[in-house]
A protein has these predicted regions:
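Short, membrane-interfacial amphipathic segments enriched in basic
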Residues: 1-12
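Short, glycine/acidic-rich beta->alpha junctions
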Residues: 10, 254-256, 269
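Generic anion/oxyanion-binding catalytic loop in active/binding sites
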Residues: 3, 38, 136
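Basic-flanked hydrophobic alpha-helices used for secretion and membrane insertion
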Residues: 47-265
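Hydrophobic alpha-helical transmembrane segments of multi-pass inner-membrane transport and secretion
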Residues: 20-51, 266-292
Length: 292
């Protein structure tokens, strides 16, 4: 390529060229601008659609963590927690225990009684906006929708009596009176409404589920974990590595990636479709500019 030292001459030649083909050059500039605008709009629109779909799935399925493990026995939970804590890929994690379903005809929706630490409650998008999570054995934090349906004032210190299912196979139930220590605005669009109890209450009253019972569909007393990695790269590989290191070798066991973050799932936005659209825009822009 010839290097032109005289910039004034270059500007003069460019100016004359523009004046000689003014109409065509103006159309070419407009075509370039429109192509750039279309490309930018396509990219921004695609990213917005992906993020919007992700936010919707996170809200609907009540899971904002990158990966999670559910329905674990005491032994499996202990082994997995040790592995998570040793992993350099993990930024933070949350833990919880599923006690059972809330039982009351006045609910009209699904209610789950659980223990959750702050990270786990955050992954469910059910952190108290008023008050705090339970610390004492007789404390409870719950959705405002539950309080409304039971006719209890949403006020810290109010007492509430709840019945929950200890074991669905044995038809075993437990009823206790709690003191409200926190609550948040319930959302009708989510899968269920949460009731958080303290760790002390959960360990004292949860069903001692066995691994065999978990395999047969009894999840009461099952332990669970939510994990956030330091970044979103290779979520499948990171999750698989932790699961295998914790001793989970069977398919469907151990940790699983949150589908909301897996953009290659069948029901998620297809990257191949995005690439095809981008190539189409580039080709169309090139042909328009070339023909001018």
């Amino acid at each position: 390529m010839v290097k032109v030292e005289n910039k004034e001459t270059l500007r003069l030649l460019t100016s004359r060229f523009m004046k000689m083909n003014r109409a065509r050059n103006i159309i070419a500039v407009i075509a370039i601008m429109l192509t750039s605008l279309l490309f930018t709009s396509l990219f921004v629109g695609s990213v917005s659609m992906i993020l919007s779909k992700r936010a919707t799935e996170i809200k609907q399925f009540m899971d904002s963590a990158h990966a999670s493990a559910q329905n674990l026995s005491e032994e499996d939970a202990k082994r997995l927690q040790e592995t998570i804590e040793q992993s350099e890929q993990v930024e933070r994690y949350g833990s919880g225990i599923f006690l059972g379903a809330g039982m009351d005809e006045r609910f009209g929706f699904s209610v789950e009684v659980r223990y959750a630490d702050e990270n786990m409650a955050e992954s469910f998008n059910c952190l108290p906006t008023t008050g705090r999570l339970p610390e004492k054995e007789n404390e409870v934090a719950l959705s405002s929708m539950i309080l409304e349906n039971l006719g209890v004032r949403p006020k810290i210190g109010e007492e509430i009596t709840l019945t929950w299912e200890v074991n669905p196979m044995l038809k075993q139930y437990k009823t206790d009176t709690f003191q409200i220590c926190g609550f948040w605005q319930g959302d009708k669009a989510v899968l269920g409404q949460m009731v958080w109890v303290s760790e002390a209450y959960a360990k004292e009253n949860c069903y001692p589920v066995t691994e065999e019972e978990l395999e047969n569909g009894i999840y009461n007393g099952g332990k669970e974990y939510s994990v956030w990695y330091k970044n979103l790269w290779n979520l499948e590989k990171k999750t698989e590595t932790i699961s295998k290191a914790a001793g989970f070798t069977k398919a469907g066991t151990g940790m699983e990636v949150n589908p909301a973050y897996n953009l290659l799932e069948e029901d998620s936005f297809s990257f191949s479709s995005l690439i095809v659209m981008i190539l189409f825009v580039i080709l169309a822009g090139y042909l328009i500019i070339y023909n001018i």
